[in-house]
């Protein structure tokens, strides 16, 4: 290890952890596929043993997921959450664990193929937006990525059984498709006689029993019933084929998608160089390729399902790229061209990443709308109903204030009941026209269907607008039309209206709701709220507080 290579390695790692932290800071909100883990982390930190208040009991999702990764993150991020935003604390904790796993791979590459190869592995990864962007996100695939990275690190150290054991744990607890990656690794190791079948069975069975036992005990406690979540998810998505309900893609989808995920046009070139000139690196190429090939037979495809393969390819590319810094391996002219191509590819990747980060900030209108509502309304006790789409695009329990009441009712019949919906002070919805009778639009997020590419100071000097389509729907903040008093009210202030139609009330208390015989009430108790009970003719019968 030369001093220059060592400095390069340290700087590359600092750059990677900085990118992960900055990306999560610029886009702190999460989407629906991340909601289970995010809500679980919040509930474990907030409610601890009081499972009755956990979000998954009301919104369990299509399939069960393991609580083990969320429990781990909740414990690690608990103390940091005292000093920074709890949402960011959780995101940064996941990001740190992801970086540490990448650093582990880099160290193993450095010991086997040279420090420069380890540094180039990190550089390749830094310039790949999708990999870095998702490394701090509470996705089960990212928890799986952390595990598969550590497995890859042990593989590079020739610790084959340790590598296999980690993959078994990850497949049993986090993501079942990792079992396919495990099979794709075991086959060449057996054929090359790097492992024996007897010891493989011993390690595999013991690891499986430990992993399944841990998941069965811990997850059964949180779910309130005996279960092995990842087995249920596998049966639901693969055996029953229910994953296709979320859409299907052609067989070649992943292979077309890979160059876009690399974001660096030279990655494939250095993969080829590595395959041709460095025999030990070939395992890093055909194992993930075979994994992607077999996985492509499943109709429902999302790029995050194959994210585990990206570090394998990056490792092989980095080993191949390190040859371009070795003048004795190639002619001088070829050496200069390859080195120029390497740096050009890295620069291109960073430019593309900067652009994509800017665009992705528009992908969370729900979270942005709730943040904007906090800027508009500073009353300590407010009730908000949030429709499905805003909750899918950034709203989590981490975003909620303890003194506010939040409702996520999805039943169309209840939402169409004017008395039910009128009990809320504000609505956050993508469909404001459904509530025109009782609410006014006061703010919108993502109302512009286009995302401007150029900054304002530059676009003012260009006659033609340069923009791209905004894929996210607009979200609106609606305020209740009824006028309200600014000070808390008591029952006696409105007792004179008893026996009269409730519509005669012109100035309503700050916190209230109207209750008809068929009204389904929210279950919260609020000390300052007045409840106006009416009969079928809208005559006020009595008033209560709370």
UniProtKB/Swiss-Prot annotation:
Q: What is its EC number?
A: 2.4.1.260
**GO molecular function list:** alpha-1,6-mannosyltransferase activity; dolichyl-P-Man:Man(7)GlcNAc(2)-PP-dolichol alpha-1,6-mannosyltransferase
Where it sits in the cell: the answer is: Endoplasmic reticulum membrane
Recorded GO CC terms:
endoplasmic reticulum; endoplasmic reticulum membrane; lumenal side of endoplasmic reticulum membrane
| Broad enzyme group | transferase
Say which domain of life the source belongs to.
Eukaryota
Q: Keywords of this protein's UniProt record, alphabetized? A: Endoplasmic reticulum, Glycosyltransferase, Membrane, Transferase, Transmembrane, Transmembrane helix
What membrane topology is annotated for this entry?
A: Multi-pass membrane protein
Which chain regions cross the lipid bilayer?
Answer: 5-25, 67-87, 113-133, 166-186, 200-220, 258-278, 283-303, 305-325, 340-360
Gene Ontology biological process terms, A to Z: dolichol-linked oligosaccharide biosynthetic process; protein glycosylation; protein N-linked glycosylation
Q: What is its main location?
A: endoplasmic reticulum
Protein's pathway: Protein modification; protein glycosylation
Give the matching InterPro entries. Answer: GPI_mannosylTrfase (IPR005599)
Does the entry feature the keyword Transmembrane, yes or no?
A: yes
Record-stated family: Belongs to the glycosyltransferase 22 family.
Q: What does this protein do?
A: Mannosyltransferase that operates in the biosynthetic pathway of dolichol-linked oligosaccharides, the glycan precursors employed in protein asparagine (N)-glycosylation. The assembly of dolichol-linked oligosaccharides begins on the cytosolic side of the endoplasmic reticulum membrane and finishes in its lumen. The sequential addition of sugars to dolichol pyrophosphate produces dolichol-linked oligosaccharides containing fourteen sugars, including two GlcNAcs, nine mannoses and three glucoses.
Q: Can you say what this protein is called?
A: Probable Dol-P-Man:Man(7)GlcNAc(2)-PP-Dol alpha-1,6-mannosyltransferase
State the organism's lineage: Eukaryota, Fungi, Dikarya, Ascomycota, Taphrinomycotina
């Amino acid at each position: 290890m030369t001093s220059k290579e060592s400095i390069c390695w340290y700087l590359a790692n600092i750059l990677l952890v900085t990118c992960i932290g900055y990306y999560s800071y610029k886009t702190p909100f999460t989407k629906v596929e991340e909601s289970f883990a995010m809500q679980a982390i919040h509930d474990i930190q907030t409610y601890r043993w009081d499972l009755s208040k956990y979000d998954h009991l009301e919104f369990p999702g299509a399939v069960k997921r393991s609580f083990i990764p969320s429990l781990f993150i909740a414990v690690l991020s608990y103390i940091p959450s005292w000093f920074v935003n709890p949402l960011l604390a959780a995101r940064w904790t996941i990001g740190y664990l992801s970086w540490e796993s990448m650093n582990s791979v880099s160290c193993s590459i450095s010991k086997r193929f040279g420090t420069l190869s380890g540094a180039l592995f990190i550089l390749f990864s830094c310039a790949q937006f999708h990999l870095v962007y998702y490394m701090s996100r509470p996705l089960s695939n990212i928890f799986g990525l952390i595990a598969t990275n550590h497995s890859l690190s042990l593989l590079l150290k020739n610790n084959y059984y340790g590598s296999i054991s980690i993959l078994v744990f990850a497949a049993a607890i986090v993501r079942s498709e990792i079992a396919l990656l495990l099979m794709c690794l075991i086959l060449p190791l057996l054929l090359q006689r790097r492992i024996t079948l007897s010891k493989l069975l011993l390690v595999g069975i013991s690891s499986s029993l430990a992993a399944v036992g841990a998941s069965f005990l811990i997850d059964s406690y949180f779910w309130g019933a005996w279960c092995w979540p990842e087995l249920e998810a596998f049966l639901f998505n693969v055996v029953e084929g229910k994953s296709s309900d979320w859409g299907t893609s052609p067989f070649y989808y992943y292979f077309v998608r890979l160059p876009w995920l690399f974001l660096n046009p030279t990655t494939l070139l250095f993969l080829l160089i590595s395959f041709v000139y460095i025999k030990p690196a070939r395992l890093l190429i055909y194992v993930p390729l075979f994994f992607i090939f077999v996985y492509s037979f499943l109709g429902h495809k999302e790029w995050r399902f194959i994210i585990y393969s990206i570090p394998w390819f990056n490792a092989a590319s980095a080993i191949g790229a390190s040859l371009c810094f070795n003048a004795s391996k190639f002619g001088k002219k070829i050496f200069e061209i390859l080195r120029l191509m390497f740096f050009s590819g890295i620069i291109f990747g960073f430019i593309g990443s900067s652009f994509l980060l800017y665009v992705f900030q528009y992908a969370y209108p729900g979270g942005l709308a709730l943040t904007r509502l906090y800027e508009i309304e500073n009353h300590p006790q407010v009730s908000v109903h949030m429709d499905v789409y805003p909750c899918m695009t950034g709203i989590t329990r981490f975003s909620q204030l303890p003194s506010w009441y939040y409702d996520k009712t999805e039943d169309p019949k209840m939402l169409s009941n004017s008395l039910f919906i009128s009990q809320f002070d504000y609505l956050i919805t993508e469909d404001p026209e459904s509530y025109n009778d009782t609410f006014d639009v006061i703010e919108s997020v993502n109302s512009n269907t286009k995302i401007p590419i150029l900054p304002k100071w530059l676009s003012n000097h260009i006659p033609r607008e340069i923009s791209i389509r905004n894929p996210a729907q607009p979200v609106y903040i609606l305020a209740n039309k009824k006028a309200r008093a600014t000070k808390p009210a008591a029952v006696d202030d409105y007792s004179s209206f008893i026996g009269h139609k409730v519509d005669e009330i012109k100035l309503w208390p700050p916190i209230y709701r109207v209750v008809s015989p068929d009204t389904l009430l929210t279950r919260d108790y609020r000390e300052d709220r007045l409840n106006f009970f009416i009969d079928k003719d809208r005559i006020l019968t009595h008033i209560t507080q709370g």
